[in-house]
């Protein structure tokens, strides 16, 4: 199979784009892909531009500043709590990555999946997201989470026990700075007044906030602050089981639950394409199966009301990732 960077493959991708876009519009399902741990800027550009040329909807970047040498048992999405990446896994800084992705692409949305909100100063973080939104002409998604890795909090001198309330306050600050002419905030963890914040984001009323997490606290955060619920490492059936609580809480606080986009992030690997699966630990909720099983799974997601899927991969090789995306576009999209 020719590499995606070849002229032949580039022409094939271009021919597929219009059909793929039209098909996804008809099925009301947006699909995006999270960048693997890449360090080569040419490979990152190739990945992002392939997502765009295949007609998919978004490119996403994860967030870790450091990883501990010692094995952790805190990761929520494996049976024994161990993380699925080694301590040497390269994570480029998330907002920097989003700026790079904005420059590489023209149409796709670019988002964080998810930025750990308490790790960064809230005013500077709001400025960084607003800047990327301006530079990308309004394509940024602010995917947020509270974090889970205590060692990372300790290293950054951020109180682990306060990560939930800090996240809530930071999100309040984001919206204030992005929308108010004269922003002012007097909270438990942060205060400011007598300032202005420009430029505002291009997207109105503000950059969309997609809230990650799988707990009831996370679901309440979605309803209180979010435009979408973006859990990770879960199955469609699990997500469906949590929707009654989301709807009930939304009605309780006077919000229409239908305003909230439902998104799900999972690992994708086809078992019938000849691509080898890496030997790293599997996370829960992975979609690892045949082409038909993936088709059935996406239909199931659509029936539940999920309208956006974000996939990552069981391989760090950019060309294998691209082959997976091509197979999804060529074999799965038409079947939906």
Report residues per predicted region:
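Active-site-adjacent structural elements that line small-molecule/cofactor binding pockets in enzymes
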Residues: 7, 14, 18-336
